[in-house]
Amino acid sequence: MDTISNKTGEGGVIMVALEDLLNWAERSSLWPITFGLACCAIEMMGAYASHYDLDRLGVIPRNSPRQADVMIVSGTVTFKMADSIRRLYDQMPEPRYVISMGSCANCGGPYWQHGYHVVKGVDRIIPVDVYVPGCPPRPEALIGGILKLQEKIKAKLTYS
């Protein structure tokens, strides 16, 4: 309570810079669109369930890329899917972020060596901000990736 009273004036209003307020709002309300494939998508659904409850972190899934600011790509990405992933990414408004979840999305997974149809990492299609390792990664790992993305947004300096 002492820290809040130090920031408020006599009127009880907290004074902050507009950039700090925008940064707080951006990192506290991440709205992802999920591109879930295979077993990583099951773990992602577990992260949204009541035991982990991503809503408490401000992470609310969206159905449209035009409403989302985070794309979570999980599972094996094939060359036929690459255009769809790029199209969804291009439809997202700025600022937009990408989380690559699981070994398959990160580097092609167990299929990278002999799979002619597998993209060797989603970062060859779209820029990736956070990589979540694992095969499949546990919901705790996805939550750790979301927290890492929030730290990355917090470290962003300006809104120009």
UniProtKB/Swiss-Prot annotation:
Enzyme class: translocase
GO molecular function: 4 iron, 4 sulfur cluster binding; iron ion binding; NADH dehydrogenase (ubiquinone) activity; NADH:ubiquinone reductase (non-electrogenic) activity; quinone binding
Superkingdom of source: Bacteria
GO cellular component: plasma membrane; respiratory chain complex I
Cofactor binding note of this UniProt entry: Binds 1 [4Fe-4S] cluster.
Cofactor dependency: [4Fe-4S] cluster
Amino-acid positions noted as binding [4Fe-4S] cluster in the UniProt annotation, renumbered to this chain: 39-40, 104, 135
UniProt catalytic activity: a quinone + NADH + 5 H(+)(in) = a quinol + NAD(+) + 4 H(+)(out)
Keywords: 4Fe-4S, Cell membrane, Iron, Iron-sulfur, Membrane, Metal-binding, NAD, Quinone, Translocase, Transport
Annotated compartments: Cell membrane
InterPro entries from the UniProt entry: NADH_UbQ_OxRdtase-like_20kDa, NADH_UQ_OxRdtase_20Kd_su
BP GO terms, sorted: aerobic respiration; electron transport coupled proton transport
Cystine bridges: none
PANTHER family per the UniProt record, alphabetical: NADH DEHYDROGENASE (PTHR11995), NADH DEHYDROGENASE [UBIQUINONE] IRON-SULFUR PROTEIN 7, MITOCHONDRIAL (PTHR11995:SF14)
Quaternary organization: NDH-1 is composed of 14 different subunits. Subunits NuoB, C, D, E, F, and G constitute the peripheral sector of the complex.
Protein's name according to its UniProt entry: NADH-quinone oxidoreductase subunit B
